[in-house]
Every structure is written in structure tokens, then in C-alpha cells.
């Protein structure tokens, strides 16, 4: 399992942003990230300066949204849907996207379910409950 550090994630998004701005060739993963970066222009400043990005504190106490976490969740959901893992996520996602008339809105709803699943797992010390996650998405669809 690939487990990048916080700095690795921030470097990845900043480098993707830089390459996009310079119109350089992107890796397949960077191309997916670029698509989500373009849908969140409000975060462009966060990705434009690697040193500032590495030093930034997005803790809950500061009340600012974490653009790196947000985009990471978009990437995670896109990957889950592409391989239908956990099983059923693709169908639940498609149903939700149809209901909301858009993939982006569906991603944001799924983020709530994904965040809740991860929080529950951390709180309980148990593995993430994929079935509960899918049920959450299906309820929103």
C-alpha cells in the first residue's frame, strides 16, 4: 500500500500545478489530479508555492480548509470508482452523480461518507468499514 507523507502529497500537487501552468507533459496520475485542480481554482494559490505549501498549517484549530486533503480525497474517490473498490462504489457513485446532475457534486457527497468512515476507523481502532461506506453513499443517492 502506498502511504505518502504529508510533504510528499503537497509536493505532488504543487508539482502537478507547476507542470500544468508550464504546459508540460503530465503522468497519468498527474492528469487526473490536474482535472481536479482545474475544478478548484480557489486553491491555485495554495499549490503555486511549494515552500509555503510545505509550511502551511491546515489544522482544525485554524479553521481553513485543507486543499491538499480535499484534492487527495477527489483522487481517492476517482481511483475507487475506476476499479469499483470497495465493491459497489461505482454503481453508488453513478446513481449519486445522476441524482445530483454532476460528478463533482457526487464526489463532495462521497467525501462526507469517506471522511466519516475513516474517522470511525481511527476512533475504534478497527479497519475501515467498506460496507458502511457504500451504504452511506447509497443513502445519498
Language-model-detected regions and their locations in the chain:
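A short structural micro-motif
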Residues: 36, 53-54, 99, 113-120, ...
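Short coil/turn segments at secondary-structure boundaries
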Residues: 26-30, 46-50, 88-94, 108-111, ...
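Core of compact, soluble alpha-helical bundle domains
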Residues: 2-65
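Alpha-helix N-cap/helix-initiation sites
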Residues: 6, 23-27, 70, 86, ...
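Short, mixed-charge aromatic SLiMs
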Residues: 96-106, 134-141
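Glycine-rich, aromatic-bearing surface loops/beta-hairpins
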Residues: 116-141
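Heme-based O2/NO sensor domains and their adjacent alpha-helical segments
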Residues: 39, 43-98
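Short alpha-helical scaffolding segments that buttress acidic/His motifs in well-ordered protein cores
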Residues: 13, 33, 37, 72-77, ...
Amino acid at each position: 500500500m502506498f502511504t505518502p507523507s504529508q510533504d510528499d502529497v503537497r509536493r505532488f500537487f504543487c508539482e502537478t500545478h507547476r507542470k500544468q501552468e508550464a504546459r508540460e507533459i503530465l503522468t497519468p496520475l498527474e492528469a487526473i489530479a490536474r482535472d481536479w485542480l482545474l475544478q478548484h481554482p480557489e486553491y491555485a494559490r495554495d499549490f503555486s508555492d511549494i515552500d509555503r505549501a510545505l509550511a502551511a498549517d491546515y489544522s482544525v484549530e485554524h479553521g481553513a480548509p485543507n486543499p491538499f486533503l480535499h484534492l487527495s480525497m477527489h483522487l481517492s474517490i476517482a481511483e475507487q470508482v475506476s476499479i469499483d473498490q470497495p465493491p459497489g462504489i461505482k454503481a453508488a457513485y453513478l446513481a449519486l452523480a445522476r441524482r445530483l446532475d454532476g460528478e463533482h457534486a457526487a464526489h463532495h457527497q462521497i467525501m462526507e461518507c469517506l471522511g466519516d468512515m475513516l474517522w470511525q476507523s481511527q476512533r475504534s481502532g478497527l479497519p475501515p468499514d467498506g460496507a458502511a461506506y457504500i451504504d452511506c453513499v447509497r443513502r445519498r443517492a
